Amino acid sequence: HSSFMGMSLPAPRRLLELACQSLLRDEASAIAALEWLPMELFPPLFITAFTGKHSRVLKAMVQAWPFPCLPLGALMNHRQSYQDILQAVLEGLDAMLAQDPRPRRCKLQVLNLQKRVHLEFWMVWAGTRAHVCSLLEPEALQPMRNRRKVHSLTARPNPPLAPVVVLIDLCLKKGVLDESLSYLIKKVSERRGLLHLCCKKLKVFAMSKQNTNILDMVQLDSVQDLEVNCTWKLSTLRKFAPYLGQMGNLRQFLLSHVFTSSHTTLEQEEQCVGLVTSQFLNLPHLQELNLDDVSILRGRLDEILRCLKSPLETLSITNCLLFERDFRHLSQHLNVSQLKSLSFSGLNLTIISSQSLQFLLERASPTLQDLNLDECGIMDHQFLDILPALSHCSQLTTLSFCENPISMMVLEDLLRHVVGLSKLSCVIYAAPVESYEETSSNINLGRLAQMHSVLKHMLQELGRPGMVWVCAYPCPHCGCRTFHDPTPIL
């Protein structure tokens, strides 16, 4: 049984399940019944056919599907293979596309293969027609707001030969494609123009010929969330850049692990950066930019900032090397004025002037909600310099600055500055330098507990006992982050 069938069922639903099982004992009769079967009974019958792997019935049901969307991915989990089922569904889709005009009952416009999407559709077993249909309103179906290549996904009947969208999350790696994806790509290739492959979430780990062929088939303006982990040569990153420029509805972008070899010339770096950053001109909806371990970023951050078309809500630049001029451009750029989340985790801020960081925080203070300064090497004097700017961040809810050499005196000063921020609910702070043993890098837990108690008492005295303060430090044995005192300061 599927996870939906395995739960304790009310009597009417149990009767419906038994009726579906009875109907499926004679597959020919079940297929014939699809012509007159009420649309409310399609979801429970499909689930039963899916669970029992009745491929012939599934193929026929796709051709008579009375809803604009078939959320097949919601029935799948990662622990099983659904090769036969997916093949049956795609064969049904193929048969439907071959017919002109389309089958009378079929309203299918989207085959959604995303996991954990539209789960509620399958949980409705016998609601009113309006209730069932309301679960798949056109707004819920559209992979993006503005579509250039793909027709609107409204609930109207398809005109003859209107394309059907196959919506899937893709992860393009090295190696051979799994059978299901390979079969899907084959069908999309055979039905070019009638099957549109759309992808909301795309991860790219390799740019093989096979993967570039897939990218050529994807409606790239359907991509909203992109992760590019490119431990590649710069020439490969240049090859990917034009694909990025076609993702006009991109909201989130993570670019990580961009390295240069000792043989890379400065001119080659400049050409690559110029080509990649120019693609940002075509991303007017970008809201979240994450740059992790990108070596070619140093001294060139302004090239990206100049090409951003709209203000970012999230900016994360982690494990990179930035110069003073990068921070100067960042703090002066208009696109930081609406930031909600800012992370510099793993940046070496000791080479950055306090004034640049202070000015940046001042610019972001009206909207900033989350600030991460973990492992930045910030020392007391830098932290003291930015405290006034921090105290102006009226929307701040979380502040994290683990693994920085901060003294207890500065921690107490910080607490006094931020205690008036009414929305600040969680502070993850660095173990004070005084809590370390003099002869080693180990934490003296007894000493740390005393300091934690001092902060707790200060919060109570200042009227903020509900603000959570948690200390985090690296484990001396494995290096993993350890949180001191699982009971936070309350």
Where in the sequence are the language-model features?
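N-terminal adaptor-interaction module of cullin-RING ubiquitin ligase components
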Residues: 1-231
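Extended amphipathic alpha-helical scaffold segments
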Residues: 25-62, 356-359, 369-377, 381-403
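C-terminal capping region of solenoid repeat domains
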Residues: 1, 5-8, 95, 126-131, ...
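Conserved hydrophobic beta-strand positions in leucine-rich repeat
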Residues: 70, 106, 111-114, 122, ...
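Helix-rich alpha-solenoid scaffolding regions
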Residues: 55-98, 250, 260-291, 295-298, ...
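Short, solvent-exposed loop/turn at the beta-strand->alpha-helix junction
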Residues: 25-29, 39, 54, 118-120, ...
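A structural signal for leucine-rich repeat
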Residues: 213-219, 238-247, 264-283, 301-311, ...
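Amphipathic alpha-helical interface segments within eukaryotic helical scaffold
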Residues: 222-231, 249-252, 260, 272, ...
